[in-house]
């Protein structure tokens, strides 16, 4: 797309900014720093049960990547038997989604978010994103928006993009901008 030097008033820029960055408040106060998703981490106790659960969880993820969903679900259950961890529930929810078992995935995501502490920001971020996707699929845009906002506050770029997509004003603005750029070419 060609670079265009548009002369927008400060009000127009503020309107566009509020549409494309719905989480940033337009005020004179400095904006709150949102972490980058790659900076997120889960802090968990270093016990034998947690280490064993992590190893099994990784095996479950690898099985999911190979498309062995039933086997992965069994391994995730073994991981949960070792230690009840939000991360395992979040990853099992991903497997359930891929296996087209959305209701069970939603249950796991709800449990993961209830279980996750503030020290498990990575899992919370991913669980909010996954649940937002499920809610969006179910056409529950208010619930999806709420989850995407929570994930975006934790640093998810994907969640910020989803918020723009489900924002009707942003969609209208995108359409108008595309039309304007097409006319300039």
Curated annotation (Swiss-Prot):
It comes from Drosophila pseudoobscura pseudoobscura. PANTHER family: CDNA SEQUENCE BC021608 (PTHR21405), TETRATRICOPEPTIDE REPEAT PROTEIN 36 (PTHR21405:SF0). Belongs to the TTC36 family. One of its GO terms (biological process) is tyrosine metabolic process. Keywords: Repeat, TPR repeat. TPR repeats lie at residues 53-86, 88-119, 125-158. It comes from the Eukaryota. This is Tetratricopeptide repeat protein 36 homolog. Gene3D superfamilies: Tetratricopeptide repeat domain. Disulfide bonds: none annotated. InterPro entries: TPR-like_helical_dom_sf, TPR_rpt, TTC36.
């Amino acid at each position: 797309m060609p670079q265009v030097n548009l002369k927008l008033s400060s009000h127009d820029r503020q309107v566009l900014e509020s549409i494309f960055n719905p989480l940033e408040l337009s005020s004179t106060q400095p904006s709150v720093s949102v972490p980058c998703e790659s900076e997120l981490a889960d802090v968990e106790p270093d016990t034998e049960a947690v280490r064993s659960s992590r190893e099994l969880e990784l095996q479950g993820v690898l099985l999911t990547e190979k498309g062995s969903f039933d086997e992965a679900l069994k391994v995730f259950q073994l991981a949960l038997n070792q230690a009840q961890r939000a991360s395992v529930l979040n990853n099992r929810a991903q497997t359930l989604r891929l296996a087209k078992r959305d209701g069970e995935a939603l249950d796991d995501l709800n449990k993961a978010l209830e279980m996750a502490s503030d020290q498990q920001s990575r899992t919370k971020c991913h669980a909010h994103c996954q649940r937002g996707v499920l809610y969006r699929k179910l056409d529950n845009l208010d619930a999806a928006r709420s989850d995407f906002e929570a994930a975006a506050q934790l640093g998810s770029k994907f969640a910020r993009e989803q918020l723009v997509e489900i924002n009707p004003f942003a969609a209208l603005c995108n359409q108008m901008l595309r039309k304007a750029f097409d006319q300039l070419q």
